[in-house]
Amino acid sequence: MYNAFLQRTAEAIFALGKHIQTSDRFRTAAFDDKLKCAALSPCFDPALTNRETMADSVQWRIIDHCAAVTRIYAIYEQFVHEMVREHLGLLQGILPFSQLPGAIQTSYRLGLSKILEKKDGPRYADLDLSKLVDGYGLALRGQAYSLEPRAILMQEQNLRLPELHRFMSASGIEGISAWIESHRAVRDFFQAADRLGASAEKELSELIKYRNDASHGSIDIGDILHVNVLLEFCDFILAVCEAIAERVQLAGLQALKPHGHVTERGRITESLKADTVGIGKMIGGFSKGLTVYLCGETYCLERQVVSLQLNGVDHETVRLGEGTEVGFMFDGPGKKNSIIMVIEEPSGVNAMLDAQGLEAVHA
């Protein structure tokens, strides 16, 4: 569901890490006079090492420090907003407004009132007020609707863990704080080495403190973080984003399940080949290429079925009327004891309304 978004975020974080290391190496070499050309003729522009055209070493480090902590926080905040947008888009494309989680319905109503209150400001100047109000009326009347994400995406502070928890809860995504702290990627991060903070909450608070200081210009030589700490923040935010993506994914599945749009097909009881092969008793239809979700109390993995076997025989497609043992090969590691969940082909809100004989009116 969100693997592509996570991959794009990972690429942005990797790019930042490369920049941090490259800038550090180049600065060190430039000021240690280690940038030499082995050829008889110059192999690079001598201006690159001209002290008159370079910031001094301390100012260079301050600039790199500020750029790094500002960028890594921006990547994190953007990812959170992106996940909430996608979560809302998934649900509104399938469920009538009345079937959305109560937290979303309440947050949307309150968010609309804040937009109306601040409509004359620049932040919401592009919104058509009449369409916004009419669209909400359609949603309340059980007709086809489209949510304005900005009514939900209202954060009161920087996204420290308590604020992230509040922000996600308002979007119908509960328990994000405990989920992040217990997620395997975050646990692996803290187990790998001594960290600036002793928990995800403290590590995130440290990052935001440095980011805010950088934004306000209150940085001196004693505040500059070593390149290894900047890279630590990169690794940390990548782990946090992985945890968030899985929690949002699971929240979407759980919201759709009571209405029949997601079904549990069985449990993986045996894992082989570095967990890429899973075996368990299943029910329903499966095919090669099918996207499935392997879910547990602290994870929700999106995987594609690469191959499947029934009684040791490969099949392109199987349809099981009762619990039958099936072997899967996935495109990535799974987990033993995970529950396999599948999103059923959605009819969408418009089709549901048509089936009910209701008029589907678009905002």
Name the predicted role of every residue range.
Residues 21, 77-88, 212-220, 242-253:
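Charged/polar positions within long, soluble alpha-helices
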Residues 70, 211, 325:
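Broad gene-expression machinery/nucleic-acid interaction feature
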Residues 1-4, 8, 57-72, 192-199, ...:
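Non-transmembrane, amphipathic alpha-helical segments
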Residues 65-72, 76, 80, 84, ...:
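Short runs of predominantly hydrophobic/aromatic residues within well-ordered alpha helices
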Residues 1-67, 82-87, 94-95, 100:
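Charged alpha-helical initiation segments
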